[in-house]
């Protein structure tokens, strides 16, 4: 019985050895240390590392030749050295004394990563600033050349072959003159010049002297009434209600006399129409360049042919 008890007591350490794995009871579990190492950095820690940004979007200022930029501290190389150190696995017995140092290991890795990114951005900003300095330097150095910039398109000299004489149609357009006044008798010159007019309200209403008189003397109401009362589409009595040469002259004048009792402004239509004719004649006399004679003889004036000039440079 004692032998069995001893053998039973002696088998307990054999069963405990694989469970302990050569680790003492006071030592921490290495898996806990690994879980402590792998953790995510917070935003406060990242901001504490990089509180300023070296890259700027604003324009760079050209440094003066007498001043030299101050050298920057070489903190990036220190972080790169920390990043370049080989990682060795430590025995589990020494991990409980370096828990705090292992917790800072990801922090150093992030520092090296940020430093490498900032180094690339610093190179980019340095290259861009150097290119801008070259451009600015070239613009400053080319100051006297700016006075010789050509701002007007140069004109080439005319060659004799490029000078074309006027055609016969252009010469004979104003060749027919009046025998009495000596002015041109072509269609363009003898056409009567009307008073100026213009479209208003997005080209919906024509503003002219005739329309002003029609709306001012209420003749537009008479024209509308005659338009709706006429049966013939070809009847133009609505356009000229006071005409004596068209049909239904007595009927129209009687209707206008009755309407003038309710619209007294109709009495001003005939005087306003006479003033319009007078203004039209004065405007035509001033602006018409052609002949205004009714019965006159036409004389054809020949335009003398002028030989072309020689634009060659004298030798």
Swiss-Prot record:
Boundaries of every SPR domain copy: 177-291
Effect of residue 144 to L: Inhibits cleavage by the prolyl endopeptidase FAP
Compositional bias (Polar residues): 1-15
UniProt record, GO biological process: animal organ development; bud elongation involved in lung branching; cell fate commitment; cellular response to leukemia inhibitory factor; cellular response to vascular endothelial growth factor stimulus; ERK1 and ERK2 cascade; establishment of mitotic spindle orientation; fibroblast growth factor receptor signaling pathway
Descriptive protein name: Protein sprouty homolog 2
Family of the protein in this entry: Belongs to the sprouty family.
Result of changing residue 252 to D: Abolishes interaction with CAV1
């Amino acid at each position: 019985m004692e032998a069995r008890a001893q053998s039973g007591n002696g088998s307990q350490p054999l069963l405990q050895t694989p469970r302990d794995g050569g680790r003492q009871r006071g030592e921490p579990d290495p898996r806990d240390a690994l879980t402590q190492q792998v953790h995510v950095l917070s935003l406060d820690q990242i901001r504490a590392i990089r509180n300023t940004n070296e890259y700027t979007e604003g324009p760079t200022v050209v440094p003066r030749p007498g001043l030299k930029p101050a050298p920057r501290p070489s903190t990036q190389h220190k972080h790169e050295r920390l990043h370049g150190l080989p990682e060795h696995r430590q025995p589990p017995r020494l991990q409980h004394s370096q828990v705090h140092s292992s917790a800072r290991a990801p922090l150093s890795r992030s520092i090296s990563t940020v430093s490498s990114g900032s180094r690339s951005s610093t190179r980019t900003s340095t290259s861009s600033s150097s290119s801008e300095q070259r451009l600015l330097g070239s613009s400053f150095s080319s100051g006297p050349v700016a006075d010789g910039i050509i701002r007007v398109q140069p004109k080439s000299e005319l060659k004799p072959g490029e000078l074309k004489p006027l055609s016969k149609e252009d010469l004979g357009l104003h060749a027919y003159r009046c025998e009495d006044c000596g002015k041109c008798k072509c269609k363009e010159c003898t056409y009567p010049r009307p008073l100026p007019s213009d479209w208003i309200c997005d080209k919906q209403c024509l503003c002219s002297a005739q329309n002003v008189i029609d709306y001012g003397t209420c003749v537009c109401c008479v024209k509308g009434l005659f338009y709706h009362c006429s049966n013939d589409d070809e009847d133009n009595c609505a356009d000229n209600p006071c005409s004596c040469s068209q049909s239904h002259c007595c009927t129209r004048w009687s209707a206008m006399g009755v309407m003038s009792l309710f619209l007294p402004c109709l009495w001003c239509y005939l005087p306003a129409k006479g003033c319009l004719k007078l203004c039209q004649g004065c405007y035509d006399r001033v602006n018409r360049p052609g002949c205004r004679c009714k019965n006159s003889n036409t004389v054809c004036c020949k335009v003398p042919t002028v030989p072309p000039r020689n634009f060659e440079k004298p030798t």
